[in-house]
Amino acid sequence: MTAQSSFLQLNSIFISILIEAIPFILIGVILSGIIQMFVSEEMIARIMPKNRFLAVLFGALAGVLFPACECGIIPITRRLLLKGVPLHAGVAFMLTAPIINPIVLFSTYIAFGNRWSVVFYRGGLALAVSLIIGVILSYQFKDNQLLKPDEPGHHHHHHGTLLQKLGGTLRHAIDEFFSVGKYLIIGAFIAAAMQTYVKTSTLLAIGQNDVSSSLVMMGLAFVLSLCSEVDAFIASSFSSTFSLGSLIAFLVFGAMVDIKNLLMMLAAFKKRFVFLLITYIVVIVLAGSLLVKG
Protein backbone atom coordinates (compact mmCIF):
# COMPACT_ATOMS: atom_id res chain seq x y z
CA MET A 1 0.00 0.00 0.00
CA THR A 2 1.45 3.37 -1.02
CA ALA A 3 1.54 6.34 1.35
CA GLN A 4 -1.11 8.14 -0.70
CA SER A 5 -3.53 5.21 -0.81
CA SER A 6 -3.07 4.50 2.91
CA PHE A 7 -3.78 8.15 3.71
CA LEU A 8 -6.93 8.05 1.58
CA GLN A 9 -8.03 4.87 3.35
CA LEU A 10 -7.38 6.44 6.76
CA ASN A 11 -9.31 9.54 5.70
CA SER A 12 -12.33 7.58 4.45
CA ILE A 13 -12.46 5.38 7.59
CA PHE A 14 -12.12 8.44 9.83
CA ILE A 15 -14.98 10.26 8.09
CA SER A 16 -17.19 7.15 8.04
CA ILE A 17 -16.73 6.69 11.82
CA LEU A 18 -17.69 10.33 12.41
CA ILE A 19 -20.72 10.10 10.12
CA GLU A 20 -21.83 6.92 11.90
CA ALA A 21 -21.29 8.29 15.41
CA ILE A 22 -22.41 11.94 15.28
CA PRO A 23 -26.19 11.25 15.01
CA PHE A 24 -26.01 9.14 18.17
CA ILE A 25 -23.89 11.74 19.96
CA LEU A 26 -26.59 14.29 19.10
CA ILE A 27 -29.32 12.01 20.45
CA GLY A 28 -27.26 11.50 23.60
CA VAL A 29 -26.59 15.18 24.31
CA ILE A 30 -30.22 16.14 23.60
CA LEU A 31 -31.45 13.47 26.03
CA SER A 32 -28.84 14.72 28.51
CA GLY A 33 -30.21 18.27 28.15
CA ILE A 34 -33.79 17.04 28.60
CA ILE A 35 -32.81 15.17 31.77
CA GLN A 36 -31.07 18.30 33.09
CA MET A 37 -34.04 20.61 32.47
CA PHE A 38 -37.07 18.37 32.98
CA VAL A 39 -35.99 15.71 35.51
CA SER A 40 -35.51 16.82 39.11
CA GLU A 41 -33.50 15.14 41.84
CA GLU A 42 -36.78 14.50 43.65
CA MET A 43 -38.19 12.59 40.65
CA ILE A 44 -35.07 10.41 40.52
CA ALA A 45 -35.32 9.71 44.26
CA ARG A 46 -38.97 8.65 43.90
CA ILE A 47 -38.44 6.10 41.12
CA MET A 48 -35.00 4.73 42.05
CA PRO A 49 -35.18 1.62 44.29
CA LYS A 50 -33.34 2.02 47.60
CA ASN A 51 -32.14 -1.60 47.60
CA ARG A 52 -28.77 -1.81 45.79
CA PHE A 53 -29.63 -5.04 43.94
CA LEU A 54 -32.98 -3.69 42.73
CA ALA A 55 -31.30 -0.40 41.75
CA VAL A 56 -28.75 -2.27 39.61
CA LEU A 57 -31.52 -4.35 38.00
CA PHE A 58 -33.60 -1.21 37.40
CA GLY A 59 -30.62 0.53 35.76
CA ALA A 60 -29.78 -2.46 33.57
CA LEU A 61 -33.34 -2.96 32.34
CA ALA A 62 -33.83 0.78 31.73
CA GLY A 63 -31.44 0.30 28.81
CA VAL A 64 -34.29 -1.31 26.87
CA LEU A 65 -36.07 2.06 26.74
CA PHE A 66 -33.11 4.06 25.41
CA PRO A 67 -32.02 3.28 21.82
CA ALA A 68 -28.64 4.88 22.54
CA CYS A 69 -25.36 3.93 20.93
CA GLU A 70 -22.25 3.68 23.11
CA CYS A 71 -21.18 6.99 21.51
CA GLY A 72 -24.06 8.88 23.12
CA ILE A 73 -24.54 6.96 26.35
CA ILE A 74 -21.72 8.64 28.32
CA PRO A 75 -23.36 12.13 28.39
CA ILE A 76 -26.70 10.59 29.41
CA THR A 77 -25.11 8.52 32.20
CA ARG A 78 -23.10 11.47 33.47
CA ARG A 79 -26.21 13.63 33.65
CA LEU A 80 -28.15 10.91 35.49
CA LEU A 81 -25.32 10.57 38.04
CA LEU A 82 -25.30 14.34 38.57
CA LYS A 83 -29.05 14.11 39.20
CA GLY A 84 -28.54 11.61 41.99
CA VAL A 85 -28.70 8.19 40.32
CA PRO A 86 -26.35 5.84 42.26
CA LEU A 87 -23.12 4.91 40.48
CA HIS A 88 -23.97 1.18 40.41
CA ALA A 89 -27.34 1.82 38.73
CA GLY A 90 -25.88 4.38 36.31
CA VAL A 91 -23.08 2.06 35.19
CA ALA A 92 -25.49 -0.87 34.78
CA PHE A 93 -27.57 1.38 32.51
CA MET A 94 -24.47 2.60 30.63
CA LEU A 95 -23.35 -0.96 29.88
CA THR A 96 -26.70 -2.39 28.74
CA ALA A 97 -28.32 0.52 26.88
CA PRO A 98 -26.16 0.20 23.72
CA ILE A 99 -26.90 -3.56 23.52
CA ILE A 100 -30.30 -4.63 24.82
CA ASN A 101 -32.38 -1.95 23.13
CA PRO A 102 -34.72 -3.26 20.38
CA ILE A 103 -32.88 -1.61 17.47
CA VAL A 104 -29.56 -3.32 18.25
CA LEU A 105 -31.12 -6.71 19.00
CA PHE A 106 -33.10 -6.62 15.75
CA SER A 107 -29.99 -5.70 13.72
CA THR A 108 -28.18 -8.64 15.38
CA TYR A 109 -31.04 -10.98 14.44
CA ILE A 110 -30.93 -9.84 10.79
CA ALA A 111 -27.11 -9.87 10.53
CA PHE A 112 -26.85 -13.48 11.71
CA GLY A 113 -29.49 -14.85 9.36
CA ASN A 114 -32.47 -14.86 11.75
CA ARG A 115 -30.62 -16.77 14.49
CA TRP A 116 -32.35 -16.04 17.79
CA SER A 117 -29.58 -17.83 19.70
CA VAL A 118 -27.10 -15.06 18.84
CA VAL A 119 -29.58 -12.41 20.02
CA PHE A 120 -30.15 -14.23 23.32
CA TYR A 121 -26.44 -14.81 23.90
CA ARG A 122 -25.61 -11.16 23.18
CA GLY A 123 -28.43 -9.71 25.28
CA GLY A 124 -28.00 -12.26 28.06
CA LEU A 125 -24.24 -11.79 28.42
CA ALA A 126 -24.60 -7.99 28.35
CA LEU A 127 -27.24 -8.14 31.08
CA ALA A 128 -25.11 -10.53 33.18
CA VAL A 129 -22.00 -8.34 32.83
CA SER A 130 -23.89 -5.18 33.83
CA LEU A 131 -25.56 -6.83 36.84
CA ILE A 132 -22.33 -8.36 38.18
CA ILE A 133 -20.34 -5.15 37.72
CA GLY A 134 -23.16 -3.03 39.16
CA VAL A 135 -23.28 -5.12 42.33
CA ILE A 136 -19.47 -5.04 42.71
CA LEU A 137 -19.43 -1.24 42.31
CA SER A 138 -22.23 -0.82 44.85
CA TYR A 139 -19.87 -2.18 47.52
CA GLN A 140 -16.69 -0.63 46.17
CA PHE A 141 -17.63 3.04 45.62
CA LYS A 142 -19.86 5.36 47.63
CA ASP A 143 -19.65 8.47 45.41
CA ASN A 144 -20.38 8.93 41.69
CA GLN A 145 -16.66 8.91 40.62
CA LEU A 146 -17.18 11.84 38.23
CA LEU A 147 -14.24 14.17 37.61
CA LYS A 148 -16.59 17.12 38.18
CA PRO A 149 -19.05 15.79 40.76
CA ASP A 150 -20.87 19.09 41.04
CA GLU A 151 -21.63 21.83 38.55
CA PRO A 152 -22.36 25.26 40.03
CA GLY A 153 -25.36 26.90 38.43
CA HIS A 154 -26.73 23.61 37.14
CA HIS A 155 -29.33 23.07 39.86
CA HIS A 156 -33.07 23.63 40.00
CA HIS A 157 -33.35 24.44 36.30
CA HIS A 158 -36.48 22.30 36.16
CA HIS A 159 -38.44 25.40 37.32
CA GLY A 160 -39.59 27.88 34.65
CA THR A 161 -41.76 28.09 31.56
CA LEU A 162 -41.71 25.48 28.82
CA LEU A 163 -39.85 27.85 26.48
CA GLN A 164 -37.21 28.52 29.15
CA LYS A 165 -36.77 24.79 29.69
CA LEU A 166 -36.47 24.13 25.95
CA GLY A 167 -33.91 26.93 25.65
CA GLY A 168 -31.97 25.48 28.56
CA THR A 169 -32.13 22.01 27.00
CA LEU A 170 -30.64 23.38 23.78
CA ARG A 171 -27.85 25.23 25.62
CA HIS A 172 -26.95 22.14 27.65
CA ALA A 173 -26.99 19.96 24.52
CA ILE A 174 -24.66 22.35 22.67
CA ASP A 175 -22.23 22.56 25.63
CA GLU A 176 -22.26 18.77 26.03
CA PHE A 177 -21.75 18.20 22.28
CA PHE A 178 -18.60 20.34 22.16
CA SER A 179 -17.41 18.77 25.41
CA VAL A 180 -17.60 15.17 24.16
CA GLY A 181 -17.13 15.93 20.45
CA LYS A 182 -13.39 16.50 20.69
CA TYR A 183 -12.92 13.08 22.28
CA LEU A 184 -15.01 11.50 19.52
CA ILE A 185 -12.76 13.11 16.88
CA ILE A 186 -9.55 11.97 18.60
CA GLY A 187 -10.93 8.46 19.13
CA ALA A 188 -12.17 8.20 15.55
CA PHE A 189 -8.74 9.22 14.22
CA ILE A 190 -6.91 6.67 16.40
CA ALA A 191 -9.37 3.94 15.36
CA ALA A 192 -8.97 4.86 11.68
CA ALA A 193 -5.17 4.83 11.96
CA MET A 194 -5.15 1.42 13.62
CA GLN A 195 -7.55 -0.01 11.02
CA THR A 196 -5.32 1.35 8.26
CA TYR A 197 -1.92 0.31 9.57
CA VAL A 198 -2.61 -2.77 11.74
CA LYS A 199 -3.30 -5.79 9.54
CA THR A 200 -6.36 -7.87 10.42
CA SER A 201 -4.45 -10.98 9.33
CA THR A 202 -2.00 -10.37 12.20
CA LEU A 203 -4.85 -10.53 14.69
CA LEU A 204 -6.39 -13.58 13.02
CA ALA A 205 -3.11 -15.48 13.29
CA ILE A 206 -3.09 -15.01 17.08
CA GLY A 207 -6.56 -16.44 17.74
CA GLN A 208 -5.85 -20.17 17.76
CA ASN A 209 -7.93 -21.29 20.79
CA ASP A 210 -11.10 -20.21 22.60
CA VAL A 211 -9.38 -17.82 25.01
CA SER A 212 -7.07 -16.19 22.48
CA SER A 213 -9.77 -15.96 19.80
CA SER A 214 -12.14 -14.20 22.23
CA LEU A 215 -9.35 -11.81 23.27
CA VAL A 216 -8.51 -11.13 19.61
CA MET A 217 -12.13 -10.36 18.77
CA MET A 218 -12.44 -8.11 21.82
CA GLY A 219 -9.29 -6.30 20.70
CA LEU A 220 -10.66 -6.01 17.19
CA ALA A 221 -13.94 -4.58 18.51
CA PHE A 222 -11.99 -2.01 20.54
CA VAL A 223 -9.96 -0.96 17.49
CA LEU A 224 -12.81 -0.89 14.97
CA SER A 225 -14.95 1.29 17.28
CA LEU A 226 -18.19 0.43 15.50
CA CYS A 227 -21.58 1.68 16.66
CA SER A 228 -23.63 -1.11 18.21
CA GLU A 229 -26.37 -0.74 15.60
CA VAL A 230 -24.04 -1.99 12.84
CA ASP A 231 -21.37 -4.11 14.55
CA ALA A 232 -23.33 -7.37 14.13
CA PHE A 233 -22.95 -7.17 10.35
CA ILE A 234 -19.16 -7.00 10.74
CA ALA A 235 -19.14 -9.80 13.32
CA SER A 236 -21.18 -12.09 11.08
CA SER A 237 -18.50 -11.81 8.38
CA PHE A 238 -16.13 -13.65 10.77
CA SER A 239 -18.56 -16.55 11.35
CA SER A 240 -16.51 -18.99 9.28
CA THR A 241 -13.24 -18.02 11.01
CA PHE A 242 -14.12 -17.62 14.69
CA SER A 243 -16.26 -19.50 17.21
CA LEU A 244 -19.66 -18.19 18.26
CA GLY A 245 -18.27 -17.43 21.73
CA SER A 246 -15.59 -15.12 20.34
CA LEU A 247 -18.17 -13.39 18.10
CA ILE A 248 -20.37 -12.76 21.17
CA ALA A 249 -17.29 -11.36 22.95
CA PHE A 250 -16.84 -8.98 19.99
CA LEU A 251 -20.49 -7.90 20.10
CA VAL A 252 -20.67 -7.35 23.86
CA PHE A 253 -17.23 -5.90 24.59
CA GLY A 254 -17.20 -3.57 21.59
CA ALA A 255 -20.54 -2.04 22.58
CA MET A 256 -19.22 -1.40 26.11
CA VAL A 257 -15.64 -0.29 25.43
CA ASP A 258 -13.99 1.06 22.30
CA ILE A 259 -11.42 3.75 21.55
CA LYS A 260 -13.82 6.66 21.22
CA ASN A 261 -15.99 5.96 24.25
CA LEU A 262 -12.90 5.13 26.36
CA LEU A 263 -11.71 8.70 25.78
CA MET A 264 -15.18 9.99 26.68
CA MET A 265 -15.17 7.91 29.88
CA LEU A 266 -11.74 9.28 30.82
CA ALA A 267 -13.10 12.80 30.30
CA ALA A 268 -16.12 12.11 32.55
CA PHE A 269 -14.85 9.73 35.25
CA LYS A 270 -11.81 9.37 37.50
CA LYS A 271 -9.02 7.38 35.83
CA ARG A 272 -8.79 4.72 38.56
CA PHE A 273 -12.49 4.02 38.25
CA VAL A 274 -12.29 3.72 34.44
CA PHE A 275 -9.34 1.31 34.73
CA LEU A 276 -11.21 -0.89 37.22
CA LEU A 277 -14.41 -0.80 35.18
CA ILE A 278 -12.65 -1.89 31.99
CA THR A 279 -10.79 -4.63 33.87
CA TYR A 280 -14.08 -6.00 35.17
CA ILE A 281 -15.63 -5.83 31.70
CA VAL A 282 -12.69 -7.67 30.08
CA VAL A 283 -12.65 -10.46 32.67
CA ILE A 284 -16.42 -11.04 32.80
CA VAL A 285 -17.00 -10.79 29.04
CA LEU A 286 -14.11 -13.20 28.41
CA ALA A 287 -15.41 -15.68 31.00
CA GLY A 288 -18.95 -15.42 29.62
CA SER A 289 -17.81 -15.92 26.02
CA LEU A 290 -16.11 -19.20 26.99
CA LEU A 291 -19.48 -20.53 28.18
CA VAL A 292 -21.15 -19.84 24.82
CA LYS A 293 -21.56 -22.92 22.66
CA GLY A 294 -23.00 -23.08 19.19
Swiss-Prot record:
Keywords: Cell membrane, Membrane, Transmembrane, Transmembrane helix
Hydrolase keyword on record: no
Cited InterPro entries: DUF318, UPF0718
Entry superkingdom: Bacteria
Pfam family, one: ArsP_1
Residue intervals passing through the bilayer: 15-35, 54-74, 92-112, 117-137, 174-194, 215-235, 247-267, 273-293
Membrane topology, from the record: Multi-pass membrane protein
Cellular-component GO terms for this entry: plasma membrane
Compartment annotation: Cell membrane
Family: Belongs to the UPF0718 family.
Family matches, as PANTHER family: UPF0718 PROTEIN YCGR
The protein's name: UPF0718 protein YcgR
Lineage: Bacteria, Bacillati, Bacillota, Bacilli, Bacillales
Encoding gene, per UniProt annotation: ycgR
